[in-house]
Amino acid sequence: MIELAQIQRIAKKPLEQVLFDMKMAGLETIPGGGAEVFSDRVQSDLFWTKADSEEWLRIASIAHQCGLPSNATMLYGHIENSEEKVYHLTRLREVQDETSGFLAYIPLSFHPERTELEHLPMPSGCLDLKEIAI
């Protein structure tokens, strides 16, 4: 999703026009990455250079309204807490209720090696199973 914001800036066109052009060129779905976790706290601590949660959700909604379904993702296993994960899922659910545009929910496990958070343990298999079960 966040790549679409960059394409829009470079093209200097409205997002709807960018999506229309991409659809006419053969785009059928959008991967939906870059959501990370919808939390202002996490965003400001870890992902401050990326588009924020509201931008991601706005792009997803517009893409779905333009007839381009997507996946929904959440990056887990870093500094997020349970409440932030529930909030993330709730926001995804709201967009899904409005647009019916998400094809799949994909939980993505954080890999801390070679990052500022390499002191954190890898998410456990148990946590992976819990996230998938959601």
Question: What spans do the regions from the language model cover?
Answer:
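Short, small-residue-enriched loops and turns at beta-alpha junctions
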Residues: 4-8, 77-81, 122-124
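Short glycine-enriched, charge-decorated loop/helix-capping segments at active-site entrances
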Residues: 44-50, 119-124
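Active-site mouth loops of central-metabolism enzymes
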Residues: 2-14, 45-50
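Conserved C-terminal portion of the radical SAM core fold
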Residues: 20-35, 54-116, 127-134
